């Protein structure tokens, strides 16, 4: 009986870990805020447990998430939004003191080791502005619609009028 329970538990864990994966983590600057876009897959029925953290000088600082307790110094500076396959964290008043390696990690539940994570090293003077990234990287449907509309208008000779 114990063997059957162990096998069932192992299969459940394998199924969940296969269905939850961080696909990318990007960083950019919006005004004076750092924006972290954590894109992920979730093909399992289990809810996603996640954590954003900063490692600076070998010390890990939890910023936000459902795993771990965010440090007091970051609580008032973070703003979080979530979509189906993306978690977005804003860190306001970003300065060179906030430079380091940022991590987005997915967990099974509680304080278990992460099943998937991505890192990005952030340096203030190397950050790009988000405006150029967000239009194309987050929502390309409007661009596709515009291109198709222009082709349709050109095909109907509307452009030559």
From Swiss-Prot:
Signal peptide extent: 1-19
Topology with respect to the bilayer: Lipid-anchor; GPI-anchor
Positions of modified residues (Pyrrolidone carboxylic acid): 20
Classification via Pfam families: ig
BP-aspect Gene Ontology terms: angiogenesis; cell-cell adhesion; cell-cell signaling; cytoskeleton organization; focal adhesion assembly; heterotypic cell-cell adhesion; integrin-mediated signaling pathway; negative regulation of axonogenesis
In-chain residues carrying the UniProt-annotated modification Phosphoserine: 82
GO MF terms held by the record: GPI anchor binding; GTPase activator activity; integrin binding
GO CC annotation: apical plasma membrane; axolemma; cell surface; dendrite; dendrite membrane; endoplasmic reticulum; external side of plasma membrane; extracellular exosome
Main location group: membrane
Propeptide stretches in the record: 131-161
Disulfide bonds: 28-130, 38-104
Sugar-bearing residue positions: 42, 79, 119, 139
Lipidation residue positions, type GPI-anchor amidated cysteine: 130
Domain Ig-like V-type, residue spans: 20-126
Keywords: Cell membrane, Disulfide bond, Glycoprotein, GPI-anchor, Immunoglobulin domain, Lipoprotein, Membrane, Phosphoprotein, Pyrrolidone carboxylic acid, Signal
Compartmental location: Cell membrane
Function: May play a role in cell-cell or cell-ligand interactions during synaptogenesis and other events in the brain.
Identification of the protein by name: Thy-1 membrane glycoprotein
Gene behind this protein: THY1
């Amino acid at each position: 009986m114990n063997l059957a329970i162990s096998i069932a538990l192992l299969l459940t864990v394998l199924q969940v870990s296969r269905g939850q994966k961080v696909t990318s983590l990007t960083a950019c600057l919006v005004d004076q805020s750092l924006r972290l876009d954590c894109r992920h897959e979730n093909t399992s029925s289990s809810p996603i447990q996640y954590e954003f953290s900063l490692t600076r000088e070998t010390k890990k600082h939890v910023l936000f998430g459902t795993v771990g307790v965010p440090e007091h110094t970051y609580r008032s500076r973070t703003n979080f939004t979530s979509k189906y396959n993306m978690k977005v964290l804003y860190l306001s008043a970003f300065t060179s003191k906030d430079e380091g390696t940022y991590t987005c990690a997915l967990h099974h539940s509680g304080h278990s080791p992460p099943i998937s994570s991505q890192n990005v090293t952030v340096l203030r003077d190397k950050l790009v502005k988000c405006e150029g990234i967000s239009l194309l990287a987050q929502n390309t449907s409007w661009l596709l619609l515009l291109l198709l509309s222009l082709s349709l208008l050109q095909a109907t000779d509307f452009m030559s009028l």
